[in-house]
Amino acid sequence: MVNNMTDLTAQDAAWSTRDHLDDPVIGELRNRFGPDAFTVQATRTGIPVVWVKREQLLEVGDFLKKLPKPYVMLFDLHGMDERLRTHRDGLPAADFSVFYHLISIERNRDIMLKVALSENDLRVPTFTKLFPNANWYERETWEMFGIDIEGHPHLTRIMMPQTWEGHPLRKDYPARATEFDPFELTKAKQDLEMEVLTFKPEDWGMKRGTDNEDFMFLNLGPNHPSAHGAFRIILQLDGEEIVDCVPDIGYHHRGAEKMGERQSWHSYIPYTDRIEYLGGCVNEMPYVLAVEKLAGITVPDRVNVIRVMLSELFRINSHLLYISTFIQDVGAMTPVFFAFTDRQKIYDLVEAITGFRMHPAWFRIGGVAHDLPRGWDRLLREFLEWMPKRLDSYEKAALRNTILKGRSQGVAAYGAKEALEWGTTGAGLRATGIDFDVRKWRPYSGYENFDFEVPVGGGVSDCYTRVMLKVEELRQSLRILQQCLDNMPEGPFKADHPLTTPPPKERTLQHIETLITHFLQVSWGPVMPAQESFQMVEATKGINSYYLTSDGSTMSYRTRVRTPSFAHLQQIPSAIRGSLVSDLIVYLGSIDFVMSDVDR
């Protein structure tokens, strides 16, 4: 259980810039390492941000992990090219930096550690000795910035092809395809790429066999239907038993974070929909909230409730697809067709409200694109009358089936310790008995005003428990939607603020200054104050977050997107070793991921 304590962001105005020197962890660090050992940075992230010396990094991380109420999860780890950043007053000199975002479940508190690096000495020690899930994050940090990770067990490219040259998130790396030479796939290059994709067990510390027999190495994917996207897993098999495996990702990588550096704060919104392409408005929520923290915008109550309503509609939509395809992976075909009928009703409702279906790009900085249309309440009421009975039928016909239970109970099971070590969030974490839902413990967009429960498992997260928790989450989302229907506030659908983008249309027809602002914001883009902000949300597949750095420009200096699926796929080998190939298929179906969410 976590303490019922909201984070500092909820207690203060969303845009307040704070150093959080009053956070107990700052005192604990200073008592242990001295009052002058760190530089504490004031930000709008809502969490303490502490710059530590590279030589102290592992010691500080170990100290935080062993506190009485420890920081048990490495939530995120990545880097930043600081060379062109102009607003750095009071910060340590740095050409590059690496940040480590840790979470304490018992405290319901976070801390971010930062390490400053010079261009001629780009190296940090590996964090995998403390948190095993640092592995993939460090590989991506090296790949994107060229920062060497000393002691890393397998420092290779993870998102880009192994033949790729350069480090894409450096500021001197081109952001547009037109800045590259035209791509030509010659026969020699094609042969080289195929050769690079050939799996060599020795590169991963695997043996090709024992003294008596050879292991089989099997490619599952990257276009296998049970891989749920362009995803490849190389399996080391002894018969049908999985001895070990290597997940291979990156086939869906689109450079979403690099795009954030060349799109305006406003024009980046459509890209957020496509990070996790089933989540729709759920993906827009953390980005828009993070930008509003930078801008200092507090939105009207009506906007909060509308955003919650759209988010919960997309949560139900995503969960229905997840549950039905899981049932299909186990072997039952009918439910997936019924689920698409239900999802069609949601899309009709979403389209009536936003004008679009899967990717509405409907949230705005300071509000939403337009007000709710006439008749939205009737459509929502009809859906709320329809859906509960359908859920009952899914549960009775398929999810309580003894064959499905036999295939999924006890499969790919792990406990709370393993979940925290691998950065698992969402239903996978809650199935272990840890009651941690961001909507409850760190409420945003007015979730604290809604009455709903957080489904929690009994201590072990297996395939069946994860699915059944999602079913109950569906019921809770229906409760939230009913409250949106019954208690939709009156009022404007945009905040009265200079950085609301676009500004309210009626004012542009009366005030020349507002018309000029409208023109500049939709063409050039709004200028956000130079600061850092952070927002996490309970997305459809776990915790999704945006960590934004503004240098006082119309575009983000650094857009860091942390997605739950990236962490969940890294956990696969530890959860599936010793199981059968057929168990892996069930496990993959129970994770709830799409590759766009993994690869960004």
From Swiss-Prot:
InterPro entries: NADH_DH_suC, NADH_DH_suCD, NADH_Q_OxRdtase_suD, NADH_quin_OxRdtase_su_C/D-like, NADH_UbQ_OxRdtase_30kDa_su, NADH_UbQ_OxRdtase_49kDa_CS, NDH1_su_D/H, NiFe-Hase_large. Residues 1-190 are annotated as: NADH dehydrogenase I subunit C. It is a peripheral membrane protein. Gene3D superfamilies: Cytochrome-c3 Hydrogenase, chain B, NADH:ubiquinone oxidoreductase, 30kDa subunit. One of its GO terms (molecular function) is quinone binding. It is found in: Cell inner membrane. Its EC number is 7.1.1.-. Keywords: Cell inner membrane, Cell membrane, Membrane, Multifunctional enzyme, NAD, Quinone, Translocase, Transport, Ubiquinone. Pfam families: Complex1_30kDa, Complex1_49kDa. Its main location: membrane. GO terms for cellular component: NADH dehydrogenase complex; plasma membrane. PROSITE patterns: COMPLEX1_49K (PS00535). It catalyses: a quinone + NADH + 5 H(+)(in) = a quinol + NAD(+) + 4 H(+)(out). Residues 214-600 are annotated as: NADH dehydrogenase I subunit D. HAMAP family: NDH1_NuoCD_1 (MF_01359), NDH1_NuoD (MF_01358). In the N-terminal section; belongs to the complex I 30 kDa subunit family. In the C-terminal section; belongs to the complex I 49 kDa subunit family. NDH-1 is composed of 13 different subunits. Subunits NuoB, CD, E, F, and G constitute the peripheral sector of the complex. NDH-1 shuttles electrons from NADH, via FMN and iron-sulfur (Fe-S) centers, to quinones in the respiratory chain. The immediate electron acceptor for the enzyme in this species is believed to be ubiquinone. Couples the redox reaction to proton translocation (for every two electrons transferred, four hydrogen ions are translocated across the cytoplasmic membrane), and thus conserves the redox energy in a proton gradient. PANTHER family: NADH-QUINONE OXIDOREDUCTASE SUBUNIT C_D, NADH-UBIQUINONE OXIDOREDUCTASE 49 KDA SUBUNIT. NCBIfam families: NuoC_fam, NuoD, PRK06075.1, PRK11742.1. This is NADH-quinone oxidoreductase subunit C/D.
